């Protein structure tokens, strides 16, 4: 029995003919906007109906428990605390669920690679909260209704922002996630310019913590 899985590690690169097409999604590679993290996953194999599909949110770390279940390994034999959940129940008719140790899903980008600077997103149910560390800004979207992320609900729903931010802070602390910190000696004029002639950000990441499990 052979299963074939097709997936991408991130969204569109955002420029050039070979960078991919992100359609109406915001952002691109190097961000946690939907254009940077949303990409299709295709699985073909025994027992999977042709032309079946679902909109369940999945992530790369779901593959390990999926492989184990296909191989007949009982789920209670897997290491405690793994973040992923098996996708097998989704493959029959697309109506199953993925059981993970946490209901929320986090994408963490503690770098200055993009104009947004270090930022993180947390998903819970239909909501997505984005946190931008340099500006202190939050953005809240109902992804089920606004996949293009055009209607920021943060001002309308401050309690939801606070609740999701609390979950986010707890998660990043639990996994000892890498965070960006100010470097007072950084001179942006000494940073090599990019292809558009722009210099680097005013503050450069100076890591003092080892990388955790948050990912983008």
Question: Model-flagged regions — what are they?
Answer:
Residues 1-49, 59, 197-216:
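Histidine-centered active-site microenvironments of extracellular/periplasmic hydrolases
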Residues 1-2, 78-82, 181-182:
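Short, glycine/acidic-rich hinge or "gate" loops at secondary-structure transitions
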Residues 1-4, 39, 101-102, 124-127, ...:
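Loop/turn elements at helix/coil->beta-strand transitions in domains of secreted/extracellular proteins
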Residues 12-23, 27-34, 49-50, 56, ...:
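C-terminal cap/loop subdomain of S1 sulfatases and analogous C-terminal strand-loop tails that border
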Residues 63, 134-137, 143, 148-216:
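Long, internal low-complexity/basic segments
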């Amino acid at each position: 029995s052979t299963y074939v899985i097709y997936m991408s590690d991130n969204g569109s690169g955002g420029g050039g003919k070979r960078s991919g097409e992100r359609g109406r999604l915001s952002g691109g590679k190097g961000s946690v906007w939907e254009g940077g993290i949303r990409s299709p996953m295709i699985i073909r194999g025994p027992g999977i109906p042709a032309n079946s599909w679902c909109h369940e949110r999945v992530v790369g770390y779901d593959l390990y428990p999926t492989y184990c279940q296909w191989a007949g390994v009982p789920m209670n034999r897997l290491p405690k605390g793994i973040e992923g959940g098996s996708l097998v129940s989704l493959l029959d008719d697309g109506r199953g669920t993925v059981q993970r140790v946490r209901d929320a899903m986090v994408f963490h980008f503690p770098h200055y690679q993009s104009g947004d600077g270090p930022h993180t997103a947390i998903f819970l149910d239909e909501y997505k909260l984005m946190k931008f560390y340099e500006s202190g800004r939050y953005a809240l979207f109902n992804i089920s209704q606004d996949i293009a992320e055009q209607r920021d609900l943060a001002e309308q729903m401050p309690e939801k922002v606070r609740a999701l931010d609390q979950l986010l802070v707890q998660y990043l602390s639990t996994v000892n996630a890498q965070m960006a910190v100010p470097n007072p000696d950084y001179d942006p004029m000494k940073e090599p310019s990019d292809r558009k002639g722009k210099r680097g950000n005013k503050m450069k990441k100076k890591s003092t913590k080892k990388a955790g499990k948050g990912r983008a």
